[in-house]
């Protein structure tokens, strides 16, 4: 499993539908980048100048919304993930 460092979070990107309700298939390069996913791993938090860790607001299994162009896409064991800084997460879906 991927283990993020510092204030980074690993998100399993939700697979968006590739076909519209009317049956039209959308080319992968025409689809917008998804902005929601499930948190699968969380780093220990950023380190302050005095050596204290700042805990993150998200935890594993949280459904989140993140900035459209945030993070780095990573493929690991055939699954697509996004590794981003916690500050790029906009909201937790409850």
Curated annotation (Swiss-Prot):
The keyword Chaperone applies. SUPFAM superfamilies: GroES-like (SSF50129). Its main location: cytoplasm. Keywords: Chaperone, Cytoplasm. SMART domains: Cpn10. NCBIfam families: PRK00364.2-2, PRK00364.2-4, PRK00364.2-5. Together with the chaperonin GroEL, plays an essential role in assisting protein folding. The GroEL-GroES system forms a nano-cage that allows encapsulation of the non-native substrate proteins and provides a physical environment optimized to promote and accelerate protein folding. GroES binds to the apical surface of the GroEL ring, thereby capping the opening of the GroEL channel. This is Co-chaperonin GroES. It comes from Latilactobacillus sakei subsp. sakei (strain 23K). The gene is groES.
């Amino acid at each position: 499993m991927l283990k993020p460092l510092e204030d980074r979070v690993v998100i399993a990107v939700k697979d968006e539908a590739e076909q519209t309700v009317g049956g039209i298939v959308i080319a992968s390069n025409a689809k917008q980048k998804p902005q929601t996913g499930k948190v699968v791993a969380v780093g220990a938090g950023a380190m302050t100048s005095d050596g204290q860790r700042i805990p993150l607001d998200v935890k594993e299994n949280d459904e989140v919304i993140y900035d459209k162009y945030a993070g780095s896409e990573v493929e690991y064991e055939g699954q697509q993930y996004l590794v981003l800084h916690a500050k790029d997460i906009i909201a937790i879906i409850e």
